[in-house]
Amino acid sequence: MNFKSIKDVESHAKQLMTKEYRVEVNGRTHLLIPSKLGYRFKFDNAKRRFGYCSYRDKEISLSKPLCEYNLDNFYQINDTILHEIAHALSYKIHGSRGSGHSKRWVHVAKSIGCNGKRCYDSSEVNNIEHKYSLVCDTCGGNYPRHRKPRRDYSCAKCEPKKFDEKYLLRVVQNF
């Protein structure tokens, strides 16, 4: 199964947010629904991470650009949503001890059907092209960037210890 549009992703995420999840911890059963815990779903414009869970704002967000770029990868998008839901549930069950990618979080993640891995494997998803590159004319080094740099950089391969104008990197717009 693949998503046909970003609206399908949103609908699926909201459906998973209203589902009841059963988590067993130390012989105690927790039945939790993310939306009933106050969590909302939204998209953001991140280009380097697929998902995010904010305990303070009670938001679970997905990268709209990465989702649009990977509509044909149901498994990855679904697992990312479950990954972020696992953060919300683990925080509810364990408090700050359950945040991050601790063993407690992995247990919760696997309990709800997530693979329990910290990050997605870049070979499994389509990554967004970098709009800019910093190029060294001396060694040919190439440093991809999503945003145009606001200051000058020098090549770390040619002069790793300090900034050196002799090895100034040239900004190239890729598209």
Predicted regions and their residues:
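Active-site-proximal or metal-binding-adjacent scaffold patches in catalytic folds
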Residues: M1-D79, A88-F175
